[in-house]
A protein has these predicted regions:
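Acidic-glycine-rich active-site phosphate/pyrophosphate-binding loop
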Residues: 1-3, 31-32
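Low-complexity, flexible helical/coil segments
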Residues: 16, 44-48, 72-79, 100
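C-terminal structural segments of small proteins and small subunits
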Residues: 64, 68-97
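Compact, glycine-rich, soluble single-domain proteins
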Residues: 11-61, 86
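N-terminal loops that bind phosphate or other acidic moieties
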Residues: 3-6, 51, 95-100
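Intrinsic-disorder/low-complexity, polar/charged segments enriched in Ser/Thr/Lys/Arg/Asp/Glu/Gln
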Residues: 3-9, 64-66
Length: 100
């Protein structure tokens, strides 16, 4: 079976950028996939399944992130992570509402 690969680029639009809670959401979502997933900012690539690695990107509002995946579910992984980033971490907002 041939390895699939997929990639996309997204821009961080949330006011606080990629802080701990969004990094946690990304890492948890990425962990649902078998594919290897990397996120790159300014030439620095990190494992999307690692919260600490994601934090090292220091991605602020307006930062462009390249998401690359290789593996059997690469396109699904890219789609899921891009959706999370494009929708300003909707799950985070829903969690905040439920906690209040």
């Amino acid at each position: 079976m041939t390895e699939q690969s997929a990639s996309t680029t997204v821009k961080i639009t949330t006011e606080n950028g990629l802080h701990l809670r969004p990094a946690d959401l990304i890492a948890r979502r990425a962990a649902e996939f078998e594919s290897a997933i990397e996120i790159t900012k300014d030439g620095n690539s990190v494992d999307a399944k690692s919260i600490l690695s994601l934090m090292t990107l220091a991605a602020e509002k307006g930062s462009e992130l390249a998401i690359n995946a290789t593996g059997p579910d690469a396109q699904a992984a890219i789609d899921a992570l891009a959706e999370l980033l494009i929708n300003d971490f909707d799950e985070l907002h829903q969690t905040n509402v439920q906690e209040e």
